[in-house]
């Protein structure tokens, strides 16, 4: 573990209950969920979440290291806080997450006004590090080299009353040449199925309707259990999906991300046969060129990928399939790029997260010859975007006239106030902006509505025909009351002492 670094930091500690915090999150769903844990830790230590638009006494950056612009964004935001830190020495700044794990030796050099640097393996140390930095007037840098405590054993202050992330594993055993995540998050460690289901049950007991199972590679779940007494089980993920289907009150189950190399038919069968598993699949492709996939060490080829898509659609005809794509991987030729366009055209993705290759120091791909010129990458990227936008619009236009069930959400529609619409997600994950009509004041985030699609755009659907059904839910009650679920149910790694009691359920029956 990296030890303390001497650096002038904050002054004596004011009363914790009077101090506020803000967590700023960059990156993937794993980071979003980790930020919920960071918030839970700080609230458990006596700090209060800062109000909207207020200057917080403690600002925590939970960082991403996947792309170069994440570095630039972090240090730009840190520089914006420097004048405030200078005028208010009691303010504290903490940097955690993947970028902190990677840049442990340089964060303070680039931003010496930072008080705490912590990594991906020791997020539970944040309150103690803040106290130590404030008491000793010494900035704290503490980076663990291996997981100290399974993160889900930590308290989590959830962002939503109706939808929740549930980690089934941390880390990754794959060796994709473009990805730095395994080096920063470590080897895969899986939670026991019973512990995952206990957390899901706790969330449902508090009114949550939708959970998303999280892992870097959910298809590998079951081969690296944290508990050495738990037998390896390559069919564990399909069994976990089916077990979620037996939890009364859990209406929607999603998962991310699977890996094409290990995606098996038992998972497809579980998806098709478990009613609350949503008809959606996010399956990263990255490239349609077998030559580039080999250079990426992706362990599958385009034919296998397309075969999975065909089998999913045969079992779940209306499944919405999304993907990740990288343009401009080192050595990519026009022929390779055309192969990607061909697979995208054949796959008919409802949407895609498309990225220009970003060279990351510490990854094998960064050392490869034939780095593609930026102008070439940009031109190819635009062609891919144009193709996928056309496909997305065609796929969404095909939804017009269909009846959809929506879980009403908050923060999904930037123009909702101007258009008098609300927003929600269909069971297949599509974003729908809908007109609530005369009952609009009665519809709350967390409620469930049924409406008919009347219009389409590449990234969303419109439903202006009014509501067919509106069901008030406990999640909607909780949102209206400003209540959010909390978890921290002991999970998958040995712990000391008895777990805290589960929170009492609130709200009326659904």
Swiss-Prot record:
Domain (Radical SAM core) ranges: 158-394
Molecular function GO terms recorded: 4 iron, 4 sulfur cluster binding; metal ion binding; N6-isopentenyladenosine methylthiotransferase activity
Domain of life: Bacteria
UniProt cross-references to InterPro entries, sorted A to Z: Elp3/MiaA/NifB-like_rSAM, Methylthiotransferase, Methylthiotransferase_CS, Methylthiotransferase_N, Methylthiotransferase_N_sf, MiaB_methiolase, rSAM, rSAM_horseshoe
Cofactor, free-text remark: Binds 2 [4Fe-4S] clusters. One cluster is coordinated with 3 cysteines and an exchangeable S-adenosyl-L-methionine.
Domain MTTase N-terminal: 19-135
Keywords: 4Fe-4S, Cytoplasm, Iron, Iron-sulfur, Metal-binding, S-adenosyl-L-methionine, Transferase, tRNA processing
Protein name, UniProt field: tRNA-2-methylthio-N(6)-dimethylallyladenosine synthase
Chain's gene name: miaB
